[in-house]
Amino acid sequence: MERYRIRRERKEILKNEIEKQRDLIQKEDFRLMSNENNEHNDEHDNRLIELNKQLNILKLELEELRLQGDRFYVLNGDDTILMDIDETSKITFYLCRHFTDLTKIPIEESNESRILIVNELETVSDPSIEPIFEFQKVISSKSIHQLFSVKTNFDNNNNNNNNSNNNNNGNKPSLFERVKQNTWSLGISPLRRTTSDPTIFGERFSPPKSISNFIERFKDNKEKDKEKDNSSLSITIQNNNTATTTTTTTTTTTTTTTTTTTTTTTTTTPTSSTTVNTNINQEKLRKYSTTPSINQINNQQNIENNNNNNNNNQEIGGKILLTWSNKETSMYILKTQEESLELLELLGSHIDRSKKVTAKQSQTIKILFQKKSTIYESTNPDHEEYLKHLWSLLYPEQEFQKKSPLWKKFGFQSDDPTRDFRGMGIMGLLNLIHLVQHHNDWVQEILAQDRDYPFAVAGINISNLIFEVFQISEDSLQQPWYSSFWSSSYMAMLCSMSRHNDHAFEELYFLIFNLLDHLWIQMNATYMMFPLVIKKLKSQLNEISNFNPNSFDEVRARFDLIQRLNIIDNPIDQQQQQLQQQQQSLPLPSSPRSFLNNYQQTTTSSTSISPSKNTQNN
């Protein structure tokens, strides 16, 4: 599409500008190194600073373009696959097939599919040209954060041969050749991509703080290079002397090896036998298709291999290997190495952003856990300010009171709300403040409907529920960033929400509270059924997280979808009803203990409430 074309053109321009900028920086570095008298060092330093600023601006723009997504046509076996990467870091894989007649497209396969005209511009300019339709059927959809590693050109024989030749000649393979073996892996280091050659990170491309040491090392390397040149020159002279005695044999061998045989291959576009149109113009398909078949690429590579006899710099196809966190691997063939490297960099940009978001969110969660562990103290002025803030949001026209029946009306267990904060600390209070401040209309609507559960205590239990299902504890927060804790589906969902929202935890709290109220209505729940509603809520949360939503809007859409489906079975069967009748009245928990455990045992703590709202109000 047009936006992809414009984006790619801009990326190519930026790549060229970045290379030019790096050349300027390197030249400025050498000028500084060659200045043995240390004259005008400040001028050189300022110049380097300015050049690096300009380089960072270019790199930032290129990074932003890559984060907007792109699409790549690749080959997997005999199938043509479209990898569509969007701005939310989701990869959608489409199986592509081509038709010149819409009636040939199978209707039974049209679910989760789309049709595009690949030669639309040509048909507009020349109406005599028949349109070619590309049928794209969804194969799978995955989030980029599920990738474990990405590797490109992992079995490039030409590079291996070049490297071995360079090693035999005593020359180290060039940096370009080694970077072409570029590899990126989650398990190596956060927030950066690496290459398969770790020695690259030992090289410097700008002077260190100690310029004198760098110059000394630079001089030593130049002397070593001269020695290598002299040794290679003597080897070349010896080889020339021996070569003159074998001219006839070499000529005969060359004549023999340059004789080639011609083979013909048939270009086919992968389609099923029921949809093949024998009247399709194969020449048009080859001309307009953006996804050549395997045979086309093999044909092209054969031509390139023949041309490589005259030109060793001929471009060859690119390959990329994706390894997912579940150890599933898949290999794809692209048209060029440049395209595979661009795909590698694009995936790396999305993963870098994901790791940065995870690192930021991990710090936020640690702060939230500290607040959860902070016990509410009436003598602490900051804690009292929090309580005053909640009162002003609920009853702005009334003077603040530490103890009041209005607290019980809001859903606390008594006139003193501070007794309910013992389980979740000030975290439970802060979540209620955010809820009332940013979703006040919803709160007032629920309170007006007089639900059969105490609102404030239910909110405190939801705060505990989030920490429970996320498995947030003091031990889990000490785990490294690449552990299963930080890569869990729940944590990935929270991180995707926080990419464009600074209050992701609080907004997730609201979505869960809203879903709780919805389940309460759908299950026609009573006060005694609160633990069963919580159990159903956990099941729904697990289902939502397994969808791997990649943005705040997608998470919210998943919650809305659960509510709109209205397919919720009544969880109370006859046996459970009989069990309920035998149970004594159970309090609604306000401490961060398991809801189901509280359901099975009666608590007699001071935080317990009466078994029904009628007795509360009396």
Curated annotation (Swiss-Prot):
Residues 382-545 form the ELMO domain. The keyword Magnesium does not apply. InterPro entries: ELMO_dom, ELMO_domain-containing. The keyword Coiled coil applies. It comes from the Eukaryota. Residues 156-171, 245-275, 574-592, 602-618 have a biased composition (Low complexity). Residues 1-72 form a coiled coil. It holds the Pfam family ELMO_CED12. One of its GO terms (biological process) is actin filament organization. Residues 153-175, 245-276, 574-618 are annotated as: Disordered. GO terms for cellular component: plasma membrane. Keywords: Coiled coil. Disulfide bonds: none annotated. This is ELMO domain-containing protein C. It comes from Dictyostelium discoideum.
